[in-house]
């Protein structure tokens, strides 16, 4: 059993995958994320991120993989009709199944039904999560420390990952307008989804800037929020900020399981230490701050 497979077993992720597979086999409705977290005996707060770290794929990608796997199993029956197979595993039509087969398996359903060797090869590849191919066990310098809480002005943005600087610019423009821009103390961010798994323009992110304790209210869509406070696992990342999610995965995959600590229901955030406009990407620094119980 691989290291990742052991971790999935320990954290209840295997139970989630088995449940999803059972739902597809029985043509049952797929459960909500909160139900999946309960099956894994994990808090729903960080479940999606933990699942991604231990499988290398989102729950949605797992469903897509298992749906194709079940379709291949049903296609092995020579009397099966492609339309019946498609509907049985949850596709809306035979065309939807054909499209998924072409995009992922580079073959049509009919070709896969007729070629037992090709079908078996894909069944073997689809039987394990994408993350089993990961080989990123490198030493991590993680420090557990109690962080002081700090207030930030937050602007939620929905768009391209590369356009986050525009949201930070809007916060800074407001701060300049009220005369506190020179009091900037922290630059932080909270990823509300994973830009690696989203189509272009669908990144959901909270951009945050700290100016100390504010005396005045902030106008919508800006809002106030408190970050930090309590124990955190802190990992210093050096490199492009687009790589922070992968570094977070490594922390959750390789440090957390043997740390003896549990995740706390509070935001995981990135504390940016350098300005990309002033510092080359290769040496940009940011602290990944993971809240712990």
Task: Name each model feature, range by range.
Residues 45, 50-53, 61, 65, ...:
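A solvent-exposed interaction/effector surface
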């Amino acid at each position: 059993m691989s290291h990742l497979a052991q971790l999935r077993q320990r954290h209840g992720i295997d139970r989630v995958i088995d449940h999803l597979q059972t739902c597809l086999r029985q043509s049952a409705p797929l459960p909500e994320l909160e139900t999946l977290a309960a099956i894994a005996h994990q808090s729903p707060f960080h479940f999606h991120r933990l699942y991604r770290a231990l499988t290398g794929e989102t729950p949605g990608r797992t469903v897509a993989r298992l749906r194709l796997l079940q379709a291949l199993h049903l296609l092995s029956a020579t009397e099966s009709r492609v339309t019946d197979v498609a509907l049985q595993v949850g596709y809306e039509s035979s065309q939807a199944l054909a499209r998924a087969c072409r995009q992922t398996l580079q073959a049509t359903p009919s070709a896969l039904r007729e070629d037992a060797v090709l079908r078996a090869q894909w069944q073997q590849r689809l039987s394990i999560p994408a993350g089993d191919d990961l080989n990123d066990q490198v030493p991590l310098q993680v420090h557990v420390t109690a962080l002081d809480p700090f207030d930030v002005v937050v602007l939620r943005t929905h768009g391209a990952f590369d356009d986050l600087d525009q949201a930070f610019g809007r916060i800074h423009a407001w701060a300049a307008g009220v005369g506190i821009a020179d009091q900037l103390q922290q630059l932080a961010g909270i990823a509300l989804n994973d830009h690696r798994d989203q189509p272009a323009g669908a990144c959901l992110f909270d951009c945050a800037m700290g100016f100390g304790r504010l005396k005045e209210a902030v106008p919508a869509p800006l809002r106030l929020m408190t970050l930090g406070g309590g124990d955190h696992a802190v990992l210093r990342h050096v490199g492009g900020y687009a790589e922070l999610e992968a570094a977070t995965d490594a922390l959750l995959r390789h440090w957390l399981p043997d740390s003896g600590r549990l995740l706390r229901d509070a935001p995981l955030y990135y504390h940016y230490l350098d300005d990309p406009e002033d510092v080359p990407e290769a040496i940009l620094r940011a602290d990944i701050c993971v809240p712990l119980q």
